[in-house]
Amino acid sequence: MYQSNPKTPFVPGFEVAGTVRECSVDSKFAVGDRVVAATTVFRSGRHGSFGEYCVASENLAYKLPEEISYEAGAAILMSYLTSDFALHRRAQLKKDEIVLVNAAAGGVGISAVQLAKIEGAKVIAAVGSNEKKEFIQQFEPDLVINYQMENLKDVVEEKFGKRPVNVFYDQVGGEPYEEGIRLLSSEGRALIVGFASGNIPSQLLSYLLVKNISLMGVFMISFENEDKEYLERRMKTIFDHYLNKTIKPVYETINFDEIIKYLELIGSRKTIGRIVALR
């Protein structure tokens, strides 16, 4: 859930993998190039990746290495680039810091767990079911919690001590956000990635003040106008991680005519990983 929802009618979708069919004469791309791209432009209201053809800004389009399938590229783009931007650029995560990831079995959460582990951090993965708890174990987080069945604060503090979290990666909002904030250490950093619960929380400003906590917004798409070269470098690093098998995107491929059913599943937060629709 974001603040910049387009007006109807519109073609949904804002990430795609495919082949360049048209580009400007001074483009860094050529017709026939394999690419992944975000088809939204900040504040433009433009989306469109569910269409057979769509338009994308060069600032958020990247050449896809031949060794990476379109399906994997589509699953990687926004999840991993968002998490990399959050952890590397915004939080400046350091080795041995403790990271709490909410919704850790979703596409973005999985990427955050993997990238934090690459940086040498200790990772707490919070999920909403025992199925997801079992699933996320393959990525070797240091602690996994089903917050529907266990008390997040009690379990975390039993293992790591009082208020041990250095970086809190939140894409849920609501009550899980407030619980995570209260686990942050002095000078901790809270990364606000989204509001999957639909509940935009109050900021607990008095708590942020007395604990010297930094609240950081994460909206990678708007950063294209600030430093597109940085995003391009980080995208290359992510592709290298994939080719070196240090990250493993989790996704299910579906036929495009199944997309309504899967959008409903995503909305009910019953999916694991990402859904890639094929045309």
Model-derived segments and spans:
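Glycine-rich beta-strand-centered segment in the early N-terminal region that forms part
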Residues: 1-42, 48
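NAD(P)H cofactor-binding loop motif with strongest signal on the N-terminal glycine-rich segment
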Residues: 23, 103-104, 172
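Short, well-ordered loop/turn sites that connect or cap secondary structure elements
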Residues: 29-30, 93, 184
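NAD(P)H dinucleotide-binding glycine-rich loop of Rossmann-like/cofactor-binding domains
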Residues: 38-103
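Mid-domain Rossmann-like dinucleotide-binding core that forms the NAD(H)/NADP(H) cofactor-binding site
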Residues: 74-149
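Glycine-rich cofactor phosphate-binding loops and adjacent beta1-alpha1 units
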Residues: 143-213
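Rossmann-fold dehydrogenase core element
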Residues: 186-193, 203-247
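C-terminal hydrophobic helical "lid"/dimerization subdomain
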Residues: 226-279
